[in-house]
From Swiss-Prot:
Binds 2 magnesium or manganese ions per subunit. SMART domains: PP2Cc. This is Integrin-linked kinase-associated serine/threonine phosphatase 2C. Mn(2+) 2 binds at residues 152, 326, 381. CDD domains: PP2Cc (cd00143). The gene is Ilkap. The keyword Protein biosynthesis does not apply. Transmembrane segments: none annotated.
Length: 392
């Protein structure tokens, strides 16, 4: 079962959708389709042990300089150790590592949010450019950890606010420490446990209120461990990677997340098996998403807090990551949003305040212009736009 696939190699154009999702089994870690695709691609029998380097025409892959032998009962298998790379900082700078001339790409987040026509701003977000020290990972295996997330609340702001305040704290507490055989498997388990614990904490607090809180929230989180992105997603917020394609000499929008709505076969089957139903594209005719934090009244009907988790290795061809709630994607396709941001980044007329680097001013302007444009196009929802710059 293909649980944890990789993005397309960077020199290739984005792949078309692979068609229908596999029926009857959950696919949490699959190959990442192009952003316009709604179905998941199917790949080979790759699990979590060894991550193939993302090939690049002239950039090469990030090499490792050592390997470790992992012994199992009756047989041994060689596995490459992940890159040993420098600790990241709040400022976006190129971080070079002597080991095999590897480079950790700097990450820095920017955000803009608009209430739109809603009475209340129910979105929340988190930007943590570097939480390596807080996570305290094994320095021989992991040397930079970053975290970026957007949360789109419904039924109130309490679930999204709770997730923004607590999910990364739970992640830090559960982050792998000590000896690790497989970083990929351990990080995956950490994310699954973190989402489960955060949801349980909120539901406990919500049920203790009188009347009980009925708030819920989507969650789209990008956890960067050195040059590997782990994307955990619940609901219909999205993460998109802008990657330059050397063959077409154009930038492509690659989807890093999978939307969860009750009309999808796998989601609908789970809901019906739990005793719920889907009417008018909604759980029990009310809830638009099939996975969320909170929504206690729907958890007994098959709505789950188990995230879809995907993995992507950054390459020198990657420009930025876009995280946004559905308020943006109701009026922008992923390709349109990526091209809009690129046009802003190339705008020489953007003014820079004294003491602020020009690149920061352009990314801030890109976030604000895209959020404004979404409102102008008629998005009636809250709009949150986060762009994570990838430095080379």
């Amino acid at each position: 079962m293909d649980l944890f696939g990789d993005l397309p190699e960077p020199e290739r154009a984005p792949r078309p959708s692979a068609g229908k999702e596999a029926q009857g089994r959950p696919v949490l870690f699959e190959d990442l389709p192009p952003a316009s695709s709604t179905d998941s691609g199917s790949g080979g029998p790759l699990l979590f042990d060894d991550l193939p380097p993302a090939a690049s025409g002239n950039s090469g892959s990030l090499a490792t300089s050592g390997s470790q032998v992992v012994k199992t009962e009756g047989k041994g298998a060689k596995r490459k150790a992940p890159e040993e790379e420098k600790n990241g900082g709040e400022e976006l700078v190129e971080k070079k590592v002597c080991k095999a001339s590897s480079v950790i790409f700097g990450l820095k987040g920017y955000v803009a949010e608009r209430k739109g026509e809603r009475e209340e701003m129910q979105d929340a977000h988190v930007i943590l450019n570097d939480i390596t020290q807080e996570c305290n990972p094994p320095s021989s295996l992991i040397t930079r950890v970053s975290y970026f997330a957007v949360f789109d609340g419904h039924g109130g702001i309490r679930a999204s606010k709770f997730a923004a305040q607590n999910l990364h704290q739970n992640l830090i507490r559960k982050f792998p420490k000590g000896d690790i055989i497989s970083v990929e498997k351990t990080v995956k388990r950490c994310l699954l446990d973190t989402f489960k614990h955060t949801d349980e904490e909120f539901l406990k607090q919500a049920s203790s209120q009188k009347p009980a809180w009925k708030d819920g929230s989507t969650a789209t989180c990008v956890l960067a461990v050195d040059n590997i992105l782990y994307i955990a997603n619940l609901g219909d917020s999205r993460a998109i990677l802008c990657r330059y394609n050397e063959e077409s000499q154009k930038h492509a929008a690659l989807s890093l997340s999978k939307e969860h709505n009750p009309t999808q076969y796998e989601e609908r089957m789970r809901i019906q098996k739990a005793g719920g139903n889907v009417r008018d594209g909604r759980v029990l005719g009310v809830l638009e998403v099939s996975r969320s934090i909170g929504d206690g009244q729907y958890k007994r009907c098959g709505v789950t807090s188990v995230p879809d988790i995907r993995r992507c290795q950054l390459t020198p061809n990657d420009r930025f990551i876009l995280l946004a709630c559905d308020g943006l994607f109701k009026v922008f396709t992923p390709e349109e949003a990526v091209n809009f941001i690129l046009s802003c980044l190339e705008d020489d007329k953007i003014q820079t305040r004294e003491g602020k680097p020009a690149v920061d001013a352009r990314y801030e302007a890109a976030c604000n212009r895209l959020a404004n444009k979404a409102v102008q196009r008629g998005s009636a929802d809250n709009v949150t736009v986060m762009v994570v710059r990838i430095g080379h």
